[in-house]
Amino acid sequence: MFKNQYDTDTTTWSPTGRLFQVEYANEAVNNGSAAVGVKGADYVVLTALKRNPVSGLSSYQEKAFKLDEHVGMAISGLVADGRALSRFLRTECMNYRYMHDSDAPLVMLADIVGAKHQRHIQFAGKRPFGVGLLIAGYDRQGPRLYQTVPSGDVFDFKATAMGLRSQAARTYLERHFRGFPACDLDELVMHALRALGAATSGGVELNIKNTTIAIVGKGTPFTILTEEEARKYLDGFKTRPEDIPAVADNEEDDDELHEQPPDVEE
């Protein structure tokens, strides 16, 4: 992408009906390290690949955030923007609990953060958030998995992935998602890790240092596994050749991974 006269702010449309600032923000998400979400009958699992530290003296940046006991999120894109949105959503959860003495409905949280994304592309003087979110939780409707993007769109998924080389992960999910409702928690975690492994570059193996695993579900609050807890899944983990699509860069139709849109009554 190159600078042109239509990309100076988010309120300037190109003659072809494009908002270049929003497209640039989407590129920040697409170039972020990969994150995967997988939903079963009773659980949702998030896995995310942390960026390599700049030097041996720095640590990996966190990619998953707990928002409330029943909900959390993983991010791809600008980590600072992700932290800002995590603080915003934590505040929304606390306000709802104070007013209603119950957990905030997940569809409401997804709509709220989608509206916040959209406000930042509707007015001059603001920039889009350069981050995408995978929001995972469990409420009265059961396990839920939502994805938000810089344009403000909100999607309800059975399984999805975002970030660099995420098409390879989505291809893996498309092949296996029909069996997810019958999986127990350990099997769901392994599916999420295999999908994440498919999105890694050559020579990179998932380990307890560069991989985040988070779980939430029936009777299980949102939990980001510690390194020792993650060791159960990652010690000896290897990406299998059959988990990597032959052509990872071909965009495929992933409509089957979608649930109903959040604004459609069930």
Swiss-Prot record:
Which Gene3D superfamilies does this chain map to? Glutamine Phosphoribosylpyrophosphate, subunit 1, domain 1
Q: Name one GO biological process term.
A: ubiquitin-dependent protein catabolic process
Q: Where can this protein be found?
A: Cytoplasm; Nucleus
Principal place where this protein is found?
cytoplasm
Q: Name one GO cellular component term.
A: nucleus
Where is the sequence biased in composition, kind Acidic residues?
Answer: 249-266
Renumbered to this chain, region (Disordered) spans 235-266
Q: InterPro entries, per this entry?
A: Ntn_hydrolases_N (IPR029055), Proteasome_alpha (IPR050115), Proteasome_alpha-type (IPR023332), Proteasome_alpha1 (IPR035144), Proteasome_asu_N (IPR000426), Proteasome_sua/b (IPR001353)
Say which domain of life the source belongs to.
Eukaryota
UniProt keyword Nucleus, yes or no: yes
Keyword Disulfide bond listed: no
Q: Which UniProt keywords apply?
A: Cytoplasm, Nucleus, Proteasome
Share what the entry says about its subunit structure, partners included: The 26S proteasome consists of a 20S proteasome core and two 19S regulatory subunits. The 20S proteasome core is composed of 28 subunits that are arranged in four stacked rings, resulting in a barrel-shaped structure. The two end rings are each formed by seven alpha subunits, and the two central rings are each formed by seven beta subunits. The catalytic chamber with the active sites is on the inside of the barrel.
What the protein does comes down to:
The proteasome is a multicatalytic proteinase complex which is characterized by its ability to cleave peptides with Arg, Phe, Tyr, Leu, and Glu adjacent to the leaving group at neutral or slightly basic pH. The proteasome has an ATP-dependent proteolytic activity.
* Family (UniProt): Belongs to the peptidase T1A family.
- The name of this protein is Proteasome subunit alpha type-1
To which species is this protein native? Trypanosoma brucei rhodesiense
